[in-house]
């Protein structure tokens, strides 16, 4: 399973909000909803997040193996 928990931690550390993502990254509210629900987003969205937050993928996404 893909988790965006690191994204929210990175945003908090940087003082960024979802509004920041919408304005600076041109990320739609529906995409933010998908991120909050740990649903799939495009690689273009991941790239935009990295640019807006000046971070790497490891700072916004993590892979959690499915349980047995």
Q: Where do the model's predicted regions map?
A:
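Short, basic-rich loop-to-helix N-cap that marks the start of a DNA-contacting helix
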Residues: 39-51
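Short amphipathic helical patch at the helix-1/turn junction of helix-turn-helix
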Residues: 12, 37-40
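A short, Lys/Arg-rich alpha-helix, primarily the initiator
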Residues: 1-20
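Alpha-helical residues within the helix-turn-helix
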Residues: 12, 23, 51
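Short, charged recognition helix plus adjacent turn
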Residues: 9-10, 34-35, 61-68
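Residue-level recognition of specific faces of alpha-helices
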Residues: 31-34, 45-48, 59
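Short alpha-helical DNA-recognition segment
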Residues: 15-33
């Amino acid at each position: 399973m893909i988790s965006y928990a690191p994204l929210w931690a990175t945003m908090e550390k940087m003082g960024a909000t979802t509004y920041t993502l919408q304005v600076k990254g041109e990320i739609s509210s529906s995409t933010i909803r998908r991120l909050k629900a740990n649903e799939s987003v495009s690689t273009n969205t991941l790239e935009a997040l990295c640019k807006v937050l000046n971070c790497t993928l490891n700072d916004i996404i993590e892979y959690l193996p499915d349980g047995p």
